[in-house]
């Protein structure tokens, strides 16, 4: 019985270690995939700039995801099936929000060819895809994603105030 308990504890410990490694390795992919409602391929290069951490976690973040040509083709097929992704150009009001909030450290280049996605993450959002609803509130929590098909780069910008 004692030998059985030792083996059981060892197995449980190994499972916990494997789970922690999994979370550490794949958390970003799953988190950003949930924001844009489209799976990001594993093992793509991800760069992050984040100014969150102020009062109540206020700040902005920009994530750049670099795709290979093959990954980009698959990703485009997936966003074509998602009705909340739209072809560029982006609505002027969203482009203004993007340009007015981005700092020198966090910037998105002007993109001519690609797709865009908006998600209102505010707790009072009635339609999380309707960007007009966010203007009547004292705070904003939203994400804008832009996929550049010329350079195969996905930009995910998030603002929390």
What kind of region is each of these model predictions?
Residues 18-92:
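N-terminal export/targeting and maturation segments
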Residues 1-17:
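N-terminal Sec-pathway targeting helices
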Residues 92-161:
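Extracytoplasmic electrostatic interaction patches
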Residues 9, 22, 105-108:
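Alpha-helical interaction segments
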Residues 12-15, 77-78, 108-110:
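Intrinsically disordered, low-complexity regions enriched in Ser/Pro/Gly/Gln/His and often acidic
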Residues 14-16, 29-35, 112-113, 122-127:
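A generic short-segment signal for beta-strand/edge and adjacent turn/coil regions
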């Amino acid at each position: 019985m004692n030998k059985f308990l030792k083996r059981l504890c060892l197995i449980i410990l190994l499972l916990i270690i494997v789970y922690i490694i999994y979370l550490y390795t794949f958390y970003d992919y799953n988190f950003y995939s949930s924001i844009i409602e489209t799976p990001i391929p594993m093992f793509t290069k991800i760069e992050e700039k984040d100014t969150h951490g102020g009062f109540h976690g206020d700040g902005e973040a920009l994530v750049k995801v670099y795709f290979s040509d093959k990954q980009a083709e698959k990703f485009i097929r997936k966003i074509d099936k998602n009705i909340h992704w739209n072809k560029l150009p982006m609505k002027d009001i969203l482009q203004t929000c993007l340009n007015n909030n981005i700092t020198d450290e966090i910037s998105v280049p002007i993109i001519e060819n690609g797709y865009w996605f908006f998600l209102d993450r505010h707790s009072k959002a009635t339609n999380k895809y309707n960007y007009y609803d966010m203007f009547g509130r004292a705070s904003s929590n939203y994400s804008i994603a832009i996929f550049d098909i010329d350079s195969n780069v996905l930009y995910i910008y998030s603002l929390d105030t």
